Amino acid sequence: MRTKYGYDGVICTDWLITADEGKTPDVFAGKSWGVEKLSVAERHYKVLMSGADQFGGNNAAGPVLEAYKMGVKEHGEAAMRQRFEQSAVRLLRNIFQVGLFENPYLDAEASTQTVGKPEYMKAGYDAQLKSIVLLKNKGKILPLQKGKTVYIPKRFTPAARDWFGNTAPEKLEYPVNMDLVKKYFNVTEDPSKADVALVFVKGPNSGVGYDKQDKEKGGNGYVPISLQYGSYTAENARAQSIAAGDPVVDPTNTNRSYKGKTVTAANIADLKTILDTKAAMATKPVIVSMALSNPAVVAEFEKEAECIIASFGVQDQALLDIVSGAAEPSALLPVQMPANMKTVEEQKEDVPHDMESYVDSEGNKYDFAFGLNWKGVINDSRTAKYKQKPKTALK
């Protein structure tokens, strides 16, 4: 970039590439791959001399100062001062270009006219509405008529640890703002008195693919990442992983395969809530709203739900506007919803859209670019353009 293309802007490293790796692969820590034998300061020095200006995820000045001293010893103080000033110019240039030094103070009146500006808020909210996908609408239950009485079960969230190692206690609470729901519908805690049930769940969460207990029991530590709630055994996984094991934290492990291992989603209670709600509602309709961060295997509950909505990080009001008909769904699936975990395991990493997509009880295929509006399956210029599938792997 610096020599061939003449780039003189800021180059920032990926996060934590100068830090040491965690003790186990599931620990979100350093990624000093290829330079594990160097000290932290030596890694900084190598990055600086390669032409980078900024260290992603590193707030410690000590290793940078040590790297400077290394450079002085090898190249002299004048050369290292010039190298540091070169990065300083690149970094400060961006600050000067937006006037932060010349005009560091905000005009409060001007800010209030910009921040929270109605037209900006409307644009953001409209974007949320346009991202919500209606997957199933049996008998055209949706939109719900005004005055309907809804039952919304509480959602159980088990104690869990996220990717960064942060822990959260278990909780049982309503998954949406009930005061907001009451502005749209009548609400009851008794399913027998409800016209319809509205169940809010999150997509299956089976963890990050590594389990210390598996390692302690003699395994390699790697377990499946499942897209279904119920227990899944990886019978169709590779016997030998593409990745070459853990050369740093565990050199004895040369295979990350999880073939034959079983995992269950931490939030399997979401599936139980759907099924229990259907049993409580008997013949009355159940609407499932899934907040997704990955595709999901909906075969476990699809037949028990009259309606299924998929969302990707929207506020409660947007979902309620769709359910109530204040807004019509127009979004298309940005992913395939797999028929089962077998097709997930067998898909090719370099070929998009090569999974077997789920077909629901209404005959609709939850493929890439599928979605419903109030009239039925959406067929427009978007579906004409995006429902094309590549046939072969990339070379």
Please annotate each region the language model reported:
Residues 4-6, 12-21, 37, 64-78, ...:
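C-terminal non-catalytic regions of proteins with extracellular/luminal or membrane-system context
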Residues 4-128, 346:
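Active-site or pore-adjacent capping/gating segments
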